[in-house]
């Protein structure tokens, strides 16, 4: 029998018969590993323990201790177990697809009746019975005709369509347990009992069109979440409860920040309070960019298709653009424009005005650029996913030798900004060259090394995401962690030699010849709309004093105190504090409750005692005690707190 060489993570290699399975490899290492093994990685591919290995390869055996692989298998198996449970409870239901998604999985079903909360409970119960039965999970490769016949016989039209879409020369992998079979690429666990029965929960039912096309039949999508332990599930459910309390849409209403409506889907109507947050954040970012050597520009929102064709965006992105056709006077044809979905091609146009020398580089151009992208109605979510948004966008035009220093400076700026905004930790992911790419390996080596050196220079930790860079260059993604442990990808840093070439950007080098600059796309917040949503949820509406839209309310206890209330408000406003008077004929406790719901950080209560002493009674948001302070003292303190950082 032919032999193959398998190389293990420690670098050691062993000979095995061709066709050996990872399960057999694990058992050959130790009885214990053979029992604990759940899957393998073979040449970087996640591999089922039952699949044969036919050629030399690098191999790693995975156990439940390997978080990523274990969760993928648990969630994938639960998708199959749920589909089986549904069909055992309601045999007429048709199954479609059930992938793993963040924190869990979903499966789409074709059923006449709507799934109810009681149905979800029954499905969960049957799933636990299947898990506790510890049934073996088996797999086979079938010929295409056999798979089609199998599903046609069982009246599963969606599965027939899926099989028919697979190339004719490919075999079909089938998995089954307990007599229930499903078409699947795998891998899976070895028996249903390996799935933790107390660490999953069915969460919700939603509508979904077959293959995501509204012209197709609408299905019912059941979502589930799953973890390795019951405690992890409980922690996740607690986080969801906290997230519901912090929902920026709910707080946006309570704080009178913004609204959205059907006449302008995905476009934000900012109210005075919300617009104040927006403008304060913009002023803060403008100051930080100015300090970092950026020059602010403004570019058009409506741009002729010719520029988008030249940049390559028309071909790749047209479906997500808002197209505007205009009948120009004396023109034979309509002019086709688009609302810009991104700012980068316009920034190259600014760069291209006038001859540039190497002495002009790096040139950092920043814009709070309004962009519009068509997002499907089902994907939009408050401020987090909109069609009209503003990016804190900037592009750095530089030489290859300047990439490392510019990247390091950007990471330091991003870190400082996140810290000012209350996010002390973030993750960096470096996405490296994909298989399909432009440029030489030598050029990729230089740029990837420059990014790694920049990260190390600032002392940051990072992970590498192999092959996930753009076809023209590597990129960095920055994920911050909020108060309840959720991660948000906001910042980006993308190296791009392609767009300057497409749009004719040049500079004169030290040698007197023309050269192409590198273009570094970078953002810190991502979009103002989404980042404000993140801020609201991170702080549960209790924004830092400098960022709060209404910083102080000065509330009268008796009407005779109204003149002094006006004096206090005027003194605060003169020092840059956003202060309002509340002299309504209402009890002070009512006023305090109302402004606390509105998340006003400081309420100054004033009665005749405060008038006579020229003092104020200070109540801070979330505290029950009050503090008496002199007028000058409180004005000085609040004026200092109101200053924008940086």
From Swiss-Prot:
Signal peptide: none annotated. Keywords: Aminoacyl-tRNA synthetase, ATP-binding, Cytoplasm, Ligase, Metal-binding, Nucleotide-binding, Protein biosynthesis, RNA-binding, tRNA-binding, Zinc. Zn(2+) binds at residues 344, 395, 521. One of its GO terms (molecular function) is tRNA binding. It catalyses: tRNA(Thr) + L-threonine + ATP = L-threonyl-tRNA(Thr) + AMP + diphosphate + H(+). Its EC number is 6.1.1.3. GO terms for cellular component: cytoplasm. Its cofactor is Zn(2+). Residues 1-63 form the TGS domain. Residues 247-544 are annotated as: Catalytic. It is an enzyme of class 6 (ligase). InterPro entries: aa-tRNA-synt_IIb, aa-tRNA-synth_II, aa-tRNA-synth_II/BPL/LPL, Anticodon-bd, Anticodon-bd_dom_sf, Beta-grasp_dom_sf, TGS, TGS-like. Binds 1 zinc ion per subunit. Gene3D superfamilies: 3.10.20.30, 3.30.54.20, Anticodon-binding domain, Bira Bifunctional Protein, Domain 2, Threonyl-trna Synthetase, Chain A, domain 2. The keyword Protein biosynthesis applies. SUPFAM superfamilies: Class II aaRS ABD-related, Class II aaRS and biotin synthetases, TGS-like, ThrRS/AlaRS common domain. SMART domains: tRNA_SAD. GO terms for biological process: threonyl-tRNA aminoacylation. It is found in: Cytoplasm. Its main location: cytoplasm. It comes from the Bacteria. Belongs to the class-II aminoacyl-tRNA synthetase family. HAMAP family: Thr_tRNA_synth. Homodimer. Catalyzes the attachment of threonine to tRNA(Thr) in a two-step reaction: L-threonine is first activated by ATP to form Thr-AMP and then transferred to the acceptor end of tRNA(Thr). Also edits incorrectly charged L-seryl-tRNA(Thr). This is Threonine--tRNA ligase. It comes from Cereibacter sphaeroides (strain ATCC 17029 / ATH 2.4.9).
């Amino acid at each position: 029998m032919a032999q193959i060489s398998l190389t293990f993570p420690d670098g050691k290699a062993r000979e095995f018969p061709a066709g050996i399975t990872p399960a057999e490899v694990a058992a050959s290492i130790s009885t214990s590993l053979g029992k604990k093994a759940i899957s393998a990685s073979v040449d970087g591919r996640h591999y089922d323990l039952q699949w044969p290995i036919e050629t030399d390869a690098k191999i790693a055996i995975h156990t439940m201790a390997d978080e990523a692989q274990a969760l993928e298998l648990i969630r994938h198996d639960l998708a199959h177990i749920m589909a089986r449970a549904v069909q055992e409870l309601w045999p007429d239901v048709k199954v479609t697809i059930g992938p793993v998604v963040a924190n869990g999985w979903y499966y789409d079903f074709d059923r006449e009746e709507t799934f109810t909360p009681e149905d979800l409970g029954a499905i969960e119960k049957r799933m636990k019975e299947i898990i506790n039965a510890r049934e073996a999970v088996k797999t086979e490769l079938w010929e295409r005709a056999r798979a089609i016949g199998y599903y046609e016989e069982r009246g599963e039209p969606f599965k027939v369509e899926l099989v028919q879409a697979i190339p004719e020369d490919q075999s079909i992998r089938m998995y089954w347990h307990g007599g229930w079979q499903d078409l699947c690429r795998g891998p899976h666990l070895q028996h249903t009992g390996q799935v933790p029965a107390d660490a999953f929960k069915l969460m919700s039912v939603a509508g979904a069109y077959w293959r995501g096309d509204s012209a197709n039949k609408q299905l019912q999508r059941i979502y589930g979440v799953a973890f390795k332990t019951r405690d992890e599930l409980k922690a996740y459910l607690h986080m969801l409860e906290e997230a519901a309390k912090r929902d920026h849409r709910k707080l946006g209403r309570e704080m009178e920040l913004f609204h959205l409506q059907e006449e302008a889907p995905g476009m934000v109507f900012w109210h005075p309070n919300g617009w104040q947050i927006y403008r304060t954040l913009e002023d803060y970012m403008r100051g930080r960019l100015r300090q970092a050597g950026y020059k602010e520009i403004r570019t058009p929102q409506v741009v002729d298709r010719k520029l988008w064709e030249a940049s390559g965006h028309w071909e790749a992105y047209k479906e997500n653009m808002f197209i505007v056709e205009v009948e120009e006077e004396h023109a034979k044809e309509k002019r086709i424009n688009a609302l810009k979905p991104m700012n980068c091609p316009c920034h190259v146009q600014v760069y291209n005005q006038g001859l540039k020398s190497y002495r002009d580089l790096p040139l950092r151009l920043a814009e709070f650029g309004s962009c519009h992208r068509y997002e499907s109605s089902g994907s939009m979510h408050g401020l987090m996913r909109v069609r009209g948004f503003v990016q804190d966008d900037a592009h750095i035009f530089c030489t290859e030798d300047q990439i490392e220093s510019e990247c390091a400076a950007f990471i330091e700026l991003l870190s400082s900004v996140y810290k000012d905004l209350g996010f002390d930790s973030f993750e960096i992911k470096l996405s490296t060259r994909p298989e399909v790419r432009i440029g030489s390996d030598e050029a990729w080596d230089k740029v990837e090394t420059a990014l790694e050196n920049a990260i190390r220079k600032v002392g940051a930790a990072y992970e590498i995401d192999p092959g996930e860079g753009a076809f023209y260059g590597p990129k960095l993604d920055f994920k911050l962690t909020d108060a309840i442990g959720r991660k948000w990808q906001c910042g980006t840093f993308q190296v791009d030699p392609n767009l300057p070439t497409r749009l004719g950007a040049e500079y004169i080098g030290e040698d007197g010849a023309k050269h192409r600059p590198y273009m570094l796309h970078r953002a810190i917040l991502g979009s103002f709309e989404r980042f404000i949503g993140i801020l609201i949820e991170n702080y549960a509406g209790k924004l830092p004093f400098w960022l709060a839209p209404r910083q102080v309310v000065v509330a009268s206890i008796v009407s005779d105190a109204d003149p002094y209330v006006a004096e206090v408000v005027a003194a605060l406003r003169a020092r840059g504090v956003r202060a309002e008077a509340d002299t309504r004929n209402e009890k002070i406790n009512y006023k305090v409750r109302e402004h606390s719901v509105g998340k006003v950080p400081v309420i100054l209560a004033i009665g005749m005692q405060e008038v006579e002493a020229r003092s104020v009674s200070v109540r801070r948001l979330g505290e029950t005690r009050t503090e008496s302070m002199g007028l000058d003292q409180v004005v000085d303190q609040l004026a200092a707190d109101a200053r924008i950082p940086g």
